[in-house]
Amino acid sequence: MTNADTVAARTPPPKLKTPALAVLFATVFINLVGFGLVVPLLPFFAQSLKAEAWQITLMFSAYSLGQFFAEPFWGRLSDRIGRKPVLLMTLIANALGYLMLAFVPNIWLAIAVRLFTGLGAGNISTVQGYVADVTPPEQRAGRMGLIGAAFGLGFIVGPGLGGLLTQPQLGRLGYQLPIFLAAALAAVAAVGVVVFLRESRAKADPAAPRPAFLAGLKDARDNAVVSRVLVVTLIYMAGFSAMESVFGLWSESRYQWGAREVGLSFMIVGIVSTLNQGFFAGRLARRFGESRVLATGMLLFG
């Protein structure tokens, strides 16, 4: 047993009290609200920077690319140095990313800033790790469900609010208002982490072996069920992301929509998705089987 294991065994983890749970809920909620706030305005904001269509889609991809690479990194780092500092660093990075986006002078800097913001947004696994650290096994599913609810609620509120706050008639300021709000929310969540969260994990022994990211991918590849689920999820998310990146441009060309209409459309998607996951998917899967429900969902999505 290492020294870190001994310390962890002697020091019980803090109980997950209401303020701490609220901060964790807010962290996930803010990640999705911040993402959703800028989704409806990004195409039009990029057009104000004289961006071409392919550059606009690249700006969307940059955020997701950063999040993809950052998620396992932040998770492993939180195992080493603790959950609280990682949550604080990612929230500060989010706030800085949104502030920089508001003032970028050209599309290439906007793409770089979106990549940076995505790197700071990959903290969902850290939140889940904190919940697992301080929650008894019999309560863990319920607590994780709350985190999932924050995810869904954030994607409902964010696009709708972003669309309503965008005021193109004000020029650049009309696009900056939702971005400033996203930055302010991230800053408030960072303060909440400092004030209300106790560290849930003892600092790890630097000499202790740590699981490698590529080893995890190999394990997933060797498990037939997991690998198939990952492939299906990848295809689904790729399709959704492709639609998301061009929807604003397409709806503007086809229906003369602006950020408000695009935001409300994504808000409706969030509402339907949350209702489906929370109330219908489980019941339908128990009645008709998971494979049939999954296949039907994919067909409806297409």
Tell what function each PLM region has:
Residues V7-T18, R198-V231:
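Juxtamembrane intracellular "pre-TM" segments in multi-pass secondary transporters
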Residues A70-G82, N276-E290:
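Helix-to-loop junctions at the C-terminal end of transmembrane segments
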Residues A112-G152:
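Cytoplasmic helix-loop-helix junction between adjacent transmembrane helices
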Residues F68-I107:
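Conserved MFS/SLC helix-loop-helix module at the cytosolic interface between two early adjacent transmembrane helices
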